[in-house]
C-alpha cells in the first residue's frame, strides 16, 4: 500500500472506513503521509539460504507454464502488438526502468491528466499497474520519484493525478479488508439483491445467458468499443481504465449478466490482476456497493474517446474502412456505404447483441464517465 495501515486515520479493523472514495481520500491526505521507501539492502547484508544452487537447477520457460491450450500460449505477452500497448517485461529492473522513463526521461507524467483517458499506445498512462500488482515496484517508490520530479521540474495536476490513482489503489485494499468476502458475493457489499439495491422496481436476479457472455469474452458483441477492448485483453492481458469501465457496464448493466463472471474473466486474463482492485471495481461497476451506479452509453463513449476510430480499427480489422461517423454504431451505415467499407453488419461484423429491456437506475447512473467501473478492477486502483 501507499499508506501503511497503522498510519491511516481509521480504526485498526477499518470498520469505520468510508465506503466512498472521496471521504477516504480527504481523510488520508489530510492526516496521513506515505512512509519513505525502504532502501535496498547492501551487498552481503543478508545471508544466503542453504542449498541456494538447488533453486536454480530448473529454469522454466513460457512453454513450461500450465496454459490450457496453444491459443492461450500464443498470447502470453503483448509483444505482437507493440503499437497497441506497451510490451511488458517482468521484474524489478523493468519496473524501475518504466518509472524512470515515464517520470524523468519522457516527462510524460507532466501531461498525464490530459492523456489518461487514452486507449491506444504505450504512453497515455504510466502502465505501472502490472509491476505494482506483482510487487515489482512499491507505490511508495513511485510517489517518492513523483515528488522528487515535482520539486526539481514541475508540479501540476498531472503529477498529483498519478498519486491520486495510487490512493484509489489503497482505497480498494482497505475496502476489501473491511468487507471481506462480501466483495465476491452476487449481492455485493451493500447486502441487498439486485432488485433492491441498484434498480427501480425490483428488476430481479442476474440473467443466465451463455451466448451473451461468450460474445463479450470473444469481442463479438456488435458494440465496437466493447469488442475492441475485449480483443485487446485477450491478445495482450491489458486494457485501459476507460475500456474497463465500458466493458463492465455493458456486461452487468446492459446485458444484465452476473458481474462476477466478468470479474472472474479479468482475473484470468489481466497482467495487472489485483484481487482487491479487480473485485472491488467490479462490485462497484455492477451497482452492488450501495453507491452511485455508473451506466455508460457505449456509443457516446466511443465518440468522446475514440472519435476517429483509431483504437477500434486497430483491434477490429473488419471495421478498418468504416467511416469515422459510423464507427460507434456500424449498423447505422447505409447499404452502399457498408458495401464500400467491405463491412456488412451481420455478415462481416456481428450485429449488436440483443439486450434485455432497458432498466432504470435508482442512483442517477449516467452515460459518461463518473465511476471507475471495470478497470477500477479492473479500472482504477492499478496505478495506471
Question: What do these predicted regions represent?
Answer:
Residues 112-115, 124-127, 193-200, 207-219, ...:
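Active-site-adjacent structural elements in folded domains
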Residues 366-382:
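Arginine-glycine-rich low-complexity intrinsically disordered regions
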Residues 14-201, 310, 314-367, 383-384:
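Glycine/tryptophan-enriched, flexible segments
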Residues 281-303, 311:
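Hydrophobic/aromatic-rich core segments of domains that either
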Residues 183, 189-194, 245-289:
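Active/binding-pocket-proximal capping segment
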Residues 126-130, 170, 214-215, 224-234, ...:
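Contiguous, well-ordered alpha-helical segments that form the cores/surfaces of helical PPI scaffolds
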Residues 3-15:
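Glycine-rich, charge-decorated loop segments at or immediately adjacent to ligand/cofactor-binding or catalytic sites
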Residues 93, 122, 133-140, 156-160, ...:
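Conserved structured core elements
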